[in-house]
Amino acid sequence: MGACPPKAKGPWAQLQKLLISWPVGEQDWEQYRDRVNMLQQERIRDSPLLQAAKENDLRLLKILLLNQSCDFQQRGAVGETALHVAALYDNLEAATLLMEAAPELAKEPALCEPFVGQTALHIAVMNQNLNLVRALLARGASVSARATGAAFRRSPHNLIYYGEHPLSFAACVGSEEIVRLLIEHGADIRAQDSLGNTVLHILILQPNKTFACQMYNLLLSYDEHSDHLQSLELVPNHQGLTPFKLAGVEGNTVMFQHLMQKRKHVQWTCGPLTSTLYDLTEIDSWGEELSFLELVVSSKKREARQILEQTPVKELVSFKWKKYGRPYFCVLASLYILYMICFTTCCIYRPLKLRDDNRTDPRDITILQQKLLQEAYVTHQDNIRLVGELVTVTGAVIILLLEIPDIFRVGASRYFGQTILGGPFHVIIITYASLVLLTMVMRLTNMNGEVVPLSFALVLGWCSVMYFARGFQMLGPFTIMIQKMIFGDLMRFCWLMAVVILGFASAFHITFQTEDPNNLGEFSDYPTALFSTFELFLTIIDGPANYSVDLPFMYCITYAAFAIIATLLMLNLFIAMMGDTHWRVAQERDELWRAQVVATTVMLERKMPRFLWPRSGICGYEYGLGDRWFLRVENHHDQNPLRVLRYVEAFKCSDKEDGQEQLSEKRPSTVESGMLSRASVAFQTPSLSRTTSQSSNSHRGWEILRRNTLGHLNLGLDLGEGDGEEVYHF
């Protein structure tokens, strides 16, 4: 009674799944959830057992339990038992009574979506009901039960993601006592959910960073006493991400800094100077198949790019870029420009000869044609051109050999879709290389029309030069602006432009369909009308007019409407759209530049031979830290905030003494013998006793100075961590 309907088998199972999942779309998820909740409440009201469990009605529960016809296994609308209902409403007494009568209820999960697999222990943990958790564990509740329903999956529909196990639920709600209790009863801290996420992965995804950091430390303290060879922090999920890498992908700077604090080793401190060794495990992209830096720059979340400003990532990237990345990138840019000059020269001096056949069409102006293969390489000039063509073809092959493996490694959608990684430029360069090889095939087979692939290849090849603008801080963000304008503003504008051109070109053609084309031939046929309207739209040409003849009246009306809509409205709209895109990208200028540098550095590091790009950092053996690699960073901390803090403490003390000074002014005998305050010692000021005539003005001045100092202190403390000058060594 109240249980879920039996599941269909075979093709009917897929159909049933489709019909069930149909209403659970992004737009209907809230309605679906509300409908489930309504059915659940109706079912609870219809069942005396469930209603008694909800209202903690112990008298009614005892009567029902004594009734042998009462089914303790009856379930609600989502497959929940009476124990689920009692746990949901924090009714400890009702839950205890139910477990005494039917202990097996402690292990029973919910059977229907969206709460499949949820046990009463999951609910008690989420409610942080410690006593109920103890009671459930005492009666054999499973600490390894998994809640796999749609309500517990990581999805935009759900507001929370706590994993599937009770331990991850307890860690996410921040209950240290329940976490310890579950581990004492055998909960596996290395358990993974259907996504492969451990409890550490799930903590990374929580919005409450404070609880997450505390629970992270607690769980690691238990893992340190385990017998596993691999640390829990190094266990990857199904995407190959460890908790540390997941923090980078999600842009969780708080957790990233917390983990880095656990990994750093302070060498020495001397006044404002501090030398620190930072563990580069999982950070350095050298030899990493799934690079942390590449994951950060390719993340869809803007917060991830803030990781690039954190120590030691900022110092590591800066060192690699200045020492290896920038020199190699400039060399690569120079080689590519020379290569394109060679290709362009070969195209300009391609083998041509006079046309053999006679021209029969008066509109045909062709006088030259391409030579056959046997005639193309005869003279000394042809041999020189052959060398350039071989260089061009070899370069195209090298480009494909470098690009194609990365497509399979990263995936086509991510490789071509990430702007920071240079996605559109990868499409351009691969297309260019393919066109060069196509031209070679056409040349070898004596096929006519090689001018078509050559023309496109020249345009695409020279457009690829813009990729190397990312090596310069002034030009790098502009390439991203161009990409966003082309694939964002321009694409939307082209749809509107196509509609307007089709409409007005048809109107112009119909208007001049009955007129003599010799007098005004811009709209004589439909293709010509389309092209002329396109030129008019972009104001390339002026409106066609012939004042020696009478033009159709409808032409004037149509052209006036076209001029207002196209020129005044749509072109200015397009300019405004591009201006908005420029403003938005300009706000992220520094972030985008840093991300471009990181992506370029990782790309070069992956492509270059190891002897040209040695590993960065210091081996831990030199400091007795094992085989891990470290980056040494020297920080110079500004002590001004500390000095201002002492000033503020002095001012606070002076406030307390103001009242005493007022009393001392009434007693002249004690004016000279008062104790010096901390402020007088700190500032070496005159005696704090002041005459009555000077008291008000002096007190006002001290108050202004004190407030300004407090404001300066708050600003200094907010920015104090970033004021230090950092120097990094290897």
Curated annotation (Swiss-Prot):
Intramembrane feature ranges: 524-544
Cytoplasmic topology ranges: 1-327, 409-419, 470-492, 578-730
Localization in the cell: Cell membrane; Apical cell membrane
Key word 4Fe-4S present: no
Membrane-traversing stretches: 328-348, 386-408, 420-442, 449-469, 493-513, 557-577
Membrane protein topology class: Multi-pass membrane protein
Activity regulation as described: Activated by WNK3.
Reactions the enzyme catalyzes: Ca(2+)(in) = Ca(2+)(out)
Residue ranges that the UniProt entry lists as topological domain Extracellular: 349-385, 443-448
Post-translational modification, as annotated: Glycosylated.
Keyword tags: ANK repeat, Calcium, Calcium channel, Calcium transport, Calmodulin-binding, Cell membrane, Glycoprotein, Ion channel, Ion transport, Membrane, Metal-binding, Phosphoprotein, Repeat, Transmembrane, Transmembrane helix, Transport
Annotated binding of Ca(2+), by residue: 542
Protein name: Transient receptor potential cation channel subfamily V member 5
Species the sequence originates in: Oryctolagus cuniculus
